[in-house]
Amino acid sequence: DVLQILKERKIVYAADATMQAMLSDKHGRTLVVEPGIGWREDEGRYSLITNYSILAPESTRPFVMPEDDRYEKASKMLNIYGNHFTVNNAFSILQAVCQEGIWATRVSFVYSAEENAVYYVQNNNFSQIGKYEF
């Protein structure tokens, strides 16, 4: 349903506001939505987003700090795990790339297609992983 809406309509946010969305289904397919920019459907082993645009990186490049390589770092770590990747591995990556301070990461999510569940951590408290089962 969401994919059909995206094909028929342009999704936008209010002026001077931006946000990405990642939607996933029980088959592990993901849809990355960047309002005003576009969308991408992923069917690989993982899908990854960060604070800057994945679909049009040049649009957010002026706002990215030179040392902010979290997307690239997480992508490399994901590739190292290969076929042996668990929810705990995902959280170890998220912990390695989380932000602290004024722009601290507030929520980190991991969706397990195998379990049809979303795991989450709030405010970088990686010692307390919550779980929501569908």
Task: Briefly describe each language-model feature range.
Residues D1, I5-K7, A14-F134:
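C-terminal, well-structured catalytic/ligand-binding subdomain of enzymes
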